[in-house]
């Protein structure tokens, strides 16, 4: 996907530096000259001002990577940047003006009039492999529904290549043909979502392939391209079901069709469905392949429920293989890769009776119902956190600005070094 070389706020902001005043003495000021906007930018601003004076207003895209009212990029591959200006017209409908610079002077070459009340998002990709960038625009119709339009910029024609309803979309090479496709998720009816893959033939005629997502979806959570265990690309969509469960749909291109690899044909819901909805699919081991979480409820020592998470890799035929099992403490922001054999009979309890200190104790449940403690993980805050992390029997796992994590082995067969190497922090990931 082609990305912008740079982005800009409305061009008028370029003049702000001229108006800034400092606290330097006159003797120092004489050696400094505030940056001056070029005549080219001033002339572009004049063109934009004409639009604004006619009743238009800036209307930047509300989602996605490109959210500035004015964006600069080389759309036609000539090495020169064009300016895209995102506006709302006097009638309230959104529009996009494209300005071309010729001999250091801008002129408007294209206006794209949209639908709805705003511009949801924009993106850029060469979908027909003609060497030119195509413009992808999601015109926002309602809170969750967009009209997705793809425009050719050849000779600045603005030819509409594709138009379809969309809830979310992205671009990627799902069929491994070296060309990018548009992958669209759309809400067909309440609880029913479809995934559509659009390709553009050499004659620019769109071709579509579709597959159903899990039934009963309440709302989409995350969407991205991932790599499967056999190296195949896949589209991964994670959603909340209407009962609060989390589900992961994995879609792949197989034998000329778009296939939902994880969908159970009997239930109409992915086999990745889980009531523990705090952990999302990710590359948990850092090998470049996505793993899908399958939580397993642990034996409860009290009222609070705890879960271990088995992580599975999938290939393009939907075959799954266990990669690892973890215990995720989302509350304290860490997880532990469980050593071999720990997942069977594991039980967990939390102890937080010491101010500024929370302990999570992982134990093994005996066949007679007895509990044998293995290791404790401490999350410690407060001014004396370092001292408490180094109390007798404890070892430091990780130190951050206001929090320290420490461990304590409670079984002689457990190696502290193994716990240290298996301890990881939980960091925020992507979202739709």
Question: Would you name each region that the model predicts?
Answer:
Residues 1-21:
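Sec-dependent bacterial lipoprotein signal peptides
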Residues 364-384:
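A short acidic-to-branched-hydrophobic micro-motif
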Residues 22-364, 382-406, 411, 421-432:
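Beta-propeller-forming repeat regions
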Residues 414-415:
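Histidine-centered catalytic/metal-binding microenvironments
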